[in-house]
Amino acid sequence: MDIKLLYRLIKYLKFYKKDLIIVMISLLSVSASLLLIGSVFRNLVDNGLSQNHILSVDKSILYICLLIIILSIASFFRSYFINNVAEKAVNQIRKDAYSNLITYEIEEFEELKIGDIISRLTNDIDQISTLIVNFLSFFIRNSVMLIGGVTLMFFESFKLASIVIITIPILLIPLIKFGKHVKALSKKALESKSLLASDIDETFNNIRAIYAFNNQTNKITDFDTKLQNYLTYCKTRLKIRALFFAISIAIIFLAITLVVWIGASDIVKGNLSAGQIISFIYYAIIAGFSSGGIFELLSEIHLPLAALERIITIIDKTPITHNSYLELNNSDPISIEFKNVDFTYHSRPNLRIINNMSLKINADKFIGIVGRSGGGKSTLMQLLLRFYRQESGTILINNQDITLSNPAEIRKLIAYVPQEANIFSGTIKSNIIFGNTQASDDDINEIIKITGIEEFAAKLHDGINAKIGERGVRLSGGQKQRIAIARALLRKPQILLLDEAMSALDTMSEQKLLESIKEIMKGKIIISIAHRISSIESADYILVIDKGGVAASGSHNDLSKNSEIYRNICREQLTV
């Protein structure tokens, strides 16, 4: 599985071949420079110091200085280009993950935690960057150094090199033993970190509720519990890594000590020169540190590999493909029809939300919808938007089955305004044009005037170009709703869905805005879910939704006479 993951990573890296060639040349230059220093040391001792040959000493020192300069320049290019490749590659990975994630079905987002998504697109991606740098830079460099060092050790002394080689299989034992534990702990650590991100996101999205209920202490305790769980996984993983590293270093340096001991004996016997043993020890140290570096990287690789796997699952998820048979010109008179529609949420399989619902809505109609909470009012709109797909029955627009069309084509006809206005960080204007970036200034100015935005925007320093903070934190609830409605109207939809979209406005402001909306939407369809009966009294007809079906329909006056459910809703509001 790890090999497959690395192969997927390499597929991203192949786009940066020129940079990688520079990295490889730099790596080889660094390795060659370090290895050549060993032979210079041998020459320095055997031909310079041992024979008191000052010219040979000077030449050796000059060569070492030259090699250090080459080493420094090559290290600069290696570091710059490998990190450059890593940044470009992870940005592409992040883009691919984000681009695929944003095409998920709405139901799939309900199974994901926002914090987990954020963690994957930030922390996990950073781990992949570390993997690229470590694998392509340090792992390959250490491998070249290890192979070069061992080869030159054999060139200096076959006997001593054989002693060093024996230590490599010994090092593999703890690597294999600890590797499985580290891999499992790495996955748990990432999952635990995602829970922390989710908790942070949830906390600061609901900070007012936490303050209002004086719940700061409980939230701190809850966060600390999650933090301790994450810390436990990290500490255990770090202990295993540290233990492995300590064992590796002990084995490597015991081998080097043994080499020095045997080498010193060979010098005394005249089998080796002092220069040979010094260069051998130099190569042994290089090989030892390189092998130690490799084993440490291998012990660390499980965390970034787990992160890569979590990202690849997002990238590899195949989005649902949709046919696009439905063709509807905006000039056609719009109509909507539900025929015996049933629907149940996957998260609540035992609760039928829409139950054999049938209704028809023609163009140039303002339709009000009322009903008790959980009756299926909002679900009706979300089915029309293709956020979900009905279990049975048919939903038609202009007598065309919407399931035969790409949801994006359906949504071009519709503008949707939920009760909780979706406001993005930026300006008032950027939020208004979110649904129609090609809108003219005249259209924008007309809409902000109609929706009453002009009045409060004029009091701001930069008008509609004023920054409104994250999620519109600097705006009131009513101002947010006006912006959301303006965004919907600027889209020039055939169908306008209002889900308690003016609940934050007072009754007079709501009626004034509603009249403006009806004027703009002449010849089209307005469907408005209302909590206040006064919001829909002027509707052409009202649908009373109860237990997932249409319990009654008609004008306000008709329903007041003929529908017990509607009368009860009106009576409850009057009582309140």
From Swiss-Prot:
It is an enzyme of class 7 (translocase). It is found in: Cell inner membrane. The keyword Membrane applies. The chain crosses the membrane at residues 21-41, 61-81, 135-155, 158-178, 242-262, 277-297. One of its GO terms (molecular function) is ATP hydrolysis activity. Its EC number is 7.-.-.-. Pfam families: ABC_membrane, ABC_tran. Keywords: ATP-binding, Cell inner membrane, Cell membrane, Membrane, Nucleotide-binding, Translocase, Transmembrane, Transmembrane helix, Transport. Residues 20-303 form the ABC transmembrane type-1 domain. One of its GO terms (cellular component) is plasma membrane. The ATP-binding domain (NBD) and the transmembrane domain (TMD) are fused. Part of an ABC transporter complex. Transmembrane domains (TMD) form a pore in the inner membrane and the ATP-binding domain (NBD) is responsible for energy generation. This is Putative export ATP-binding/permease protein RF_0214.
